Amino acid sequence: MEDGGAGLRAPRYPAEDTSPTTDRELRGFFCYGLAAEVFAVCAVGSFLPVTLEQLAREQGVLFIDKVTPCTAKNATVIANATVNALMSRAEGSDTHQCIINVFGAELTTASFAMYTFSASVFMQALALVSVSSVADHGTWRKKLLAGFGLTGSVSAMLFLLVVPQIFVVGSFLTVICVVCLGCSFVILNSYLPLLVLNHPVVQSDEDHPTASSSIPLQPISPQRSSRKSEESLHQVNRKEVDIGSKADSSDLQLSTKISSKGVGIGYMAAVSVQVICILILYIMNKTGVSSTLPLRTVLFFVGSWWLTFTIPSVMWLRDRPGPPLPTALYEGRAFVRTCMSYTIFAWKSLWKTVKVAVKLRQVLLFLIAWFLLSDAVATISATAILFARTELQMGTVAVALLSIIATSSGIIGATVWPIISKRFTLKTNHIIVCCLLLLELVPLYGLLGFLPFVQAWGVGGLQKWYEIYPLGIIHGMVMGGLSSYCRSFYGLLIPPGSEAAFYALFAITDKGSSAVGPAIVGKIVDATGQIRPAFGFLAVLIALPIPLIWMVDVEKGQEDAIRMAGLMKTTDDGHEDFESFEGSSDGHEAEGLMRDHD
């Protein structure tokens, strides 16, 4: 494959690189997934929240008296803290939380970590919108991938220098790391349709040359063709759907194969690196060094991993420039004008997609559910780690082991859920509901700790550290199902030809919502001094999307999507004409379209 083996297709725009995809380029694609996925799982999903909490803890005082240092070494101070803790327990306020002062605000160390991640995800959502157009247009694709990879990895490595006295710096570095990670994945994902389109397997298929061009090049088309009659509209729809169904045999299968392989490589590497990190923590903890140094060393190692594998990835990937955008959207210097043009185009595209999505009732229903669902999933992960660290007093090695168990269970879940679906002939939304019901067990089990008779047992309701590991297995199994089924279910509801725009909206909804839950949990912890009450909020948050997911009508959503796709292609001069769209009816016309679509 290295030399291609298929003739070059005609370029669709000036300066398009139509050279066949090579093994070297595919290795570059997989290599960056290997680099960044490790940081996403090992750092963001495990060690970053623990490190932030521990850095702050070493500068904090106990919540119960707001005087005693949390990491006091003096015997007298420790004795006084123990007495205070026993008195607090007798009063029914068992807490191990510490408080710190951040820019004049009094926060618990756990809420400090939650607020940091809330801010990180919010900034990431804003950045993803602005970067989305750059990923599909112009010549900055490879440069930005290298820039985000370099900036994010170096920021992670700088944690080695963050001592407890400057713990707030760790918060800023976390924001930079998370934003760079998200943006680099957007850039990397923009390579996938191009690698598929230029792959020799696809180029050699002469049966559907038009279908290849249906692979999204930009978030949303700025111009549409002239208006046709209603009859012509449906004829165009039938042709496009027929072409798309044929294209699935090669384009979609190849895309799925490449994407699945990349995810598999990334997760296997993440588990392996997680094991290495546990060894680093175990060895360094035996030396009696500062309690934060082993964690900071682990982040340095994970950041170095990210940087190391980013270098060959950038070397092996081609530039693959996209179609340029007009820079007349903003007046000013050339560089500033270009940056503003890309940013304005991205936000305009998002707004246009939102207006279309609002007209598609089933899409809107799912996106509301997805907003709640993704927020619940992101929040429960961070909450569980901090609960294990602060309430259950688990060490860093034990928390890292919990992350490995959850990740491994996720891989198993991705395999098991399709088997369950086939065995019991469950629809996709039914599988999602089953996953949510299973996930609901996690906060409900934590709430059992409030019951007096459970407290009298001394076990149950997450009173012992070992109880969290079975819950980690449940969480991992659920994530293995949700991560794949939600995306595929959403894909059934979006208009054909607008995949890039609607999946961008899907990702932005995910990241935007994930900033809400951690902030609310942080407020709860600040008010109560405990994390356990936050399980009540999480139980409600997980339950809310269940009826919404159940209500989504896939067949009606597909009908509406096809009709909207036709309407979008027949509006005059790109002006939106969606006000008249009222959703599908029960008529035979829609049924005929669905038969063509199937």
From Swiss-Prot:
One GO CC term on file: vacuolar membrane
Primary localization class, coarse: membrane
Taxonomy, superkingdom: Eukaryota
Coiled coil: none
Region named Disordered: 1-20, 207-238, 575-598
Sites where a glycan is attached: 74, 80, 285
UniProt keyword Hydrolase, yes or no: no
UniProt GO BP: amino acid transmembrane export from vacuole; autophagy
Membrane topology of this protein: Multi-pass membrane protein
Gene3D superfamilies, per database record: MFS general substrate transporter like domains
Function summary: Vacuolar effluxer which mediate the efflux of amino acids resulting from autophagic degradation. The release of autophagic amino acids allows the maintenance of protein synthesis and viability during nitrogen starvation.
UniProt protein name: Autophagy-related protein 22-1
Organism: Sclerotinia sclerotiorum (strain ATCC 18683 / 1980 / Ss-1) (White mold)
Highest classification ranks of the organism: Eukaryota, Fungi, Dikarya, Ascomycota, Pezizomycotina
